[in-house]
């Protein structure tokens, strides 16, 4: 059963890495933004 350990990988990935990546991407986007 390969799907047994899949939630233990997907939950930290979606819960920790994706928010951190989106926060960093939004931070870099707001830093290079020169509309204001």
Curated annotation (Swiss-Prot):
Protein localization: Plastid, Chloroplast thylakoid membrane
Function as written in the Swiss-Prot or TrEMBL entry: May help in the organization of the PsaL subunit.
InterPro entries xref list: PSI_PsaI, PSI_PsaI_sf
Membrane-spanning segments: 10-30
UniProt family annotation: Belongs to the PsaI family.
Species name: Skeletonema costatum (Marine centric diatom)
Keyword rRNA processing included in the entry's annotation: no
Membrane topology: Single-pass membrane protein
Listed name of the protein: Photosystem I reaction center subunit VIII
Listed HAMAP family: PSI_PsaI
Domain of life the protein comes from: Eukaryota
Gene Ontology BP term (one): photosynthesis
Protein keywords: Chloroplast, Membrane, Photosynthesis, Photosystem I, Plastid, Thylakoid, Transmembrane, Transmembrane helix
The keyword Thylakoid is annotated on this UniProt entry: yes
GO cellular component, one term: chloroplast thylakoid membrane
């Amino acid at each position: 059963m390969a799907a047994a350990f899949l939630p233990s990988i997907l939950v930290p990935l979606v819960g920790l890495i994706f928010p951190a990546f989106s926060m960093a991407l939004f931070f870099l986007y707001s830093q290079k933004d020169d509309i204001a």
